[in-house]
Amino acid sequence: MERLKLGKIPEHWCIRLVAMLLLAIIFLPSTFCDIGSVYNSSYETVIPERLPGKGGKDPGGKVSYMLLMQGQKQLLHLEVKGHYPENNFPVYSYHNGILRQEMPLLSQDCHYEGYMEGVPGSFVSVNICSGLRGVLIKEETSYGIEPMLSSKNFEHVLYTMEHQPVVSCSVTPKDSPGDTSHPPRSRKPDDLLVLTDWWSHTKYVEMFVVVNHQRFQMWGSNINETVQAVMDIIALANSFTRGINTEVVLVGLEIWTEGDPIEVPVDLQTTLRNFNFWRQEKLVGRVRHDVAHLIVGHRPGENEGQAFLRGACSGEFAAAVEAFHHEDVLLFAALMAHELGHNLGIQHDHPTCTCGPKHFCLMGEKIGKDSGFSNCSSDHFLRFLHDHRGVCLLDEPGRQSRMRRAANCGNGVVEDLEQCDCGSDCDKSQCCDENCKLKGNSVCSTELCCFKCNFKKEGDVCRPADGPCDLEEYCNGTSAACPSDRKAQDGSKCHESFLCFNGQCMDPTFQCSRIFGHGSRSASDYCYTSLNSRGDQFGNCGSSSQFPKKYTKCSDKNVMCGKLICTEVAFLPQIQPNNLLLQVPETEDWCWSVAVFDMRDSLHEEYVKDNTYCGKDKVCKNSICEDFTPFSFPCSPSKQCNKHGVCNDLGNCHCSFGFAPPDCKEEGTGGSVDSGPAVNLSNDSSPGPNSTQSSTEELILNLKLIVLAVILVLMILLIIICIISAYTKSETASEAGPSELEELPEGEKEEQEEVLPEEAKGEEEELEYGKEEAEEQGAVEEEGAEEANEEAAAEKKDEDEEEGEE
């Protein structure tokens, strides 16, 4: 009876409610405050006043503004820059896993450069479309200016940009297509004439820019804003490259809107190689370019940028990568110009190089905003041109080459007016034909919210959550597009003590599982201490970039932030020949570490990631365990989401099932305003042809649990009724039957009761038969006795008669 308690019925609901409660608790953030402020100085509100041209005429390509700056009137004289329509380049992004060509709404002739009247050495570079946005340099101080979005009076914010005055760049990779140690060559007079002629002509670098997912999120996950920001950066970079009579022309932009297709580790040298492999495989042949640069959003290790020396115009090494983890646009533009300089054959400056009145030469290892190319840079660049490595720079980009490419049906990319593009597999496609048109009644093709050529139902999950820091997205029933990928707000709690960053839980066990497979986990404190205190390739807190490498031992407080140490390893990964695995015995298991020398290997995440928990109120930063300063966000799960949801990376609530966005206060089906409706429970009698009432996996699961609970109740009731009935029968049988049955357990009673009728019947028949035989035997014996008595009486009578006669 104990195994059939009714208490089991609500256990499924209890487990489900506890799971939902734990989910809410996981994402409950602490009190956060901002740790990522880029600017540490004053702000002021200004109202730029555009001045009319002389005689009220438009000067054409020139404009002047007056603004009150630090209590003084400043007159800005600006002139349009750029010879080509600024919006005539393809912009690629990903939607539901499909590469598409975007058509952002961008204005032409927006970038202007100039100076402040009466301020020697001043410089202004701004975008004047929709207000002024850009950089002003006055008396060696950099200012940023941008419009206030909510202002009705053309108000702007003007702020100083003093944070991070310089960034660094290491020695460029050795496997670039040129040797970095060529000695100076003696030049013939004819060579000098050629070089002089080349120098007098403007060179054009056709640059393709890629923005990684994290940087895209830092720009608000907004494609138009990202495109505009990249254009501003290119405009500022041109203010540096004009020092070598070179103009950067943006020929294309790709934004990794749904995640990075390559590994983007902290080590930018590794990122550069990964990006170059991707460029050769995915970009070459799609868009013509002289160089391709990747902009990443995370804080790197030692250096802010990496580039292949002399890589421009080559098919193999025309790549560079820069980290833009702050918001100092001018400093980043200087970094991009520096890395581009490496692509153009310009090496780092030495102490004898000069660059006029500038504090920093642009090609020094330390890069500042107030910097320029040196005489050494010019010499290196001329040598690059002389070696015919820069022939592609002499071709002036024509308007036709800058225009958006017409849709190329059959390349697998949905472009311009194409309805679909089945690539080379059109014969297998049920929805798309070889002309990139939808077949028959098809309304969609390969999108995430498309199923059998029709829209998926409203509320269907189109992108499931990928881990505890990711959020589900749902189809709306009227479109094939899945909403953009949304993550949990940075700083949200995951796995008790860890934090979410960029949609990933900073739990080292996740890193171990990516290397050693399912079941492996982050090792014990003993393993981290014993290995990371060694200071060798298997345990350290960093290494030098020189060869041979020198490794830094981890101090006691930093051992959890060095090399990733794993345990409970059941499967060994396949590794490149130059890489090594080390196992060290622990008390109950093994400590595993990896040493990676071939960066193409999948093991390159060999260090504990930044923002990983390393102690109470501490996280790892560049292999150092630092104090963690909580974030400050406008969205709080306990306030804005009423404790019934979590905050996403846009600051909106993602509600739990049972509550409705935007504030999770009213009853609903979950989801958010960004992720789509979780499920449609409305009773609309006139749904669209492809928008029907449906339920999500969550509702189906709950319905299954309800049905299961009802079945269990019925089964338990039936079993109880059967047991009671059997028990009653056994009690009745025990009163009439032998006493031994009363002593038997109930289960044996039932079996005995089933056996008794057959056995009892046989015994009864035997008893009756024996009784009849006994009765018959008795009757025979009694009859024989009577006959004997009669014979004896007769004999006695005869004897008496004989005696009488005598």
Curated annotation (Swiss-Prot):
Compartment(s) of residence: Membrane
Query: Which Gene Ontology BP terms does the record give?
Result: proteolysis; spermatogenesis
Please list the residue ranges that the record marks as compositionally biased, kind Polar residues: 680-694
Keyword Transmembrane helix tagged = yes
Q: What enzyme class is recorded for this protein?
A: hydrolase
User: What InterPro entries does this protein map onto?
Assistant: ADAM_Cys-rich, Disintegrin_dom, Disintegrin_dom_sf, EGF-like_dom, MetalloPept_cat_dom_sf, Peptidase_M12B, Reprolysin_adamalysin
Q: Where is the Disintegrin domain?
A: 406-490
UniProt main location, coarse? membrane
UniProt topology in membrane: Single-pass type I membrane protein
Gene Ontology cellular-component terms for this entry are: membrane
Q: Which residue spans traverse the membrane? A: 705-725
Q: Which residues form the signal peptide?
A: 1-33
> Which CDD domains does this entry report, sorted A to Z?
ZnMc_adamalysin_II_like
Q: Which SUPFAM superfamilies match?
A: Blood coagulation inhibitor (disintegrin), Metalloproteases ('zincins'), catalytic domain
One Gene Ontology term of the molecular function aspect: metalloendopeptidase activity
PROSITE patterns from the entry?
Answer: ADAM_MEPRO (PS50215), DISINTEGRIN_2 (PS50214), EGF_2 (PS01186), EGF_3 (PS50026), ZINC_PROTEASE (PS00142)
Location of region: Disordered:
169-188, 668-694, 735-806
Q: Which residues are glycosylated?
A: 224, 375, 476, 680, 683, 690
Summarizing the function annotation, the protein's role is: May play a role in spermatogenesis and sperm maturation.
Name used for this protein in its record: Disintegrin and metalloproteinase domain-containing protein 1b
Organism encoding this protein: Mus musculus
Q: Which gene encodes it?
A: Adam1b
